[in-house]
UniProtKB/Swiss-Prot annotation:
UniProt keywords, alphabetically: Cytoplasm, DNA-binding, Phosphoprotein, Transcription, Transcription regulation, Two-component regulatory system
DNA-binding residue intervals: 200-301
Function: Member of the two-component regulatory system PfeR/PfeS. Activates expression of the ferric enterobactin receptor.
Superkingdom of origin: Bacteria
Protein's name according to its UniProt entry: Transcriptional activator protein PfeR
Post-translation changes: Phosphorylated by PfeS.
Family annotation (SMART domains): REC, Trans_reg_C
CDD domains per UniProt: trans_reg_C (cd00383)
Encoding gene per record: pfeR
Positions of the Response regulatory domain: 79-192
GO cellular component: cytosol; protein-DNA complex
Residues bearing PTM 4-aspartylphosphate: D128
InterPro entries: CheY-like_superfamily, OmpR/PhoB-type_DNA-bd, Sig_transdc_resp-reg_C-effctor, Sig_transdc_resp-reg_receiver, WalR-like, WH-like_DNA-bd_sf
Amino acid sequence: MIVQPSAVAKGWPIATTLLPASCGPADPKPEPKPKQRRLCRKVFPLRARCGALAHCPIPGKNEIFTNVNHSHISIPSPRLLLVEDDPRLREDLDAHFRRRGFRVTVCGDGSHGLEAAGREAFDLVLLDIMLPGLDGLALLESLRREQATPVMLMSALGAEQDRISGFTRGADDYLPKPFSLAELDARTDALLRRVRLDRLPLAQRRDTRLVFDDQAQDVLHQGLPAGLTPSEYRLLATLREHAGEALSKPFLYRSVLHRSYTRLDRGLDVHVCNLRRKLAVVAVRHLQIQAVRGQGYLLVETEHP
């Protein structure tokens, strides 16, 4: 296919996608060998429902999309809810995640997606925004009133204000279209690491010096309860799951306090102060909550007994 100057003038982005050689050469070069696949250039509007993948899978050649190491994910057969109205993209993503061992439930509109989320517990939701009927943002708000399942929004609306709107509605991640499968895998793996702790039995969460009690929403050190509030417990559990990693305030507000972050809101700082004080009372010295300037908070484990 030849890129028309008029298409470039309209500001349409040009994406590279893997297509059969029969789509036509981009320039007058010798014809490729039969059954050979090569890169060709394709023009599509920013909001086009097709072409969301920067690279389309080739039967028998999918190893080029699965070269990311996924062995660190500890959740066996993660349960994924995919809500996407584009049939071709929905089919490609369904096949891709099934090859990775996911159990996938697919829906073509927001209403059916909401019904599926109410029937079954999922580890991750991939959600398109521009859906027929109930749109993705409305579906996201409904999910957040009932559950804290990680949700990744997928949309051709990639402007800053669109991303901010998605995060303020409760999204855990926002992936603009077009995207590559490699980036999609990396982002889904990161979200699944956040739910890893919830899938472990209490006996496997034991620290040799600190015990997390999910039922009491408290921690015990040497048999002494710290007397944490539910918000303080969620904050410590989240920091402990991501020990050594600086977590941003917007993420902690959404994950722990279940509300959006504003610069004038000091609620998280108050919880951190109270948490430090309560841990000190029960002599927890091997965990330190550090403030990282311009980023958020970090949990550091030391060698103190």
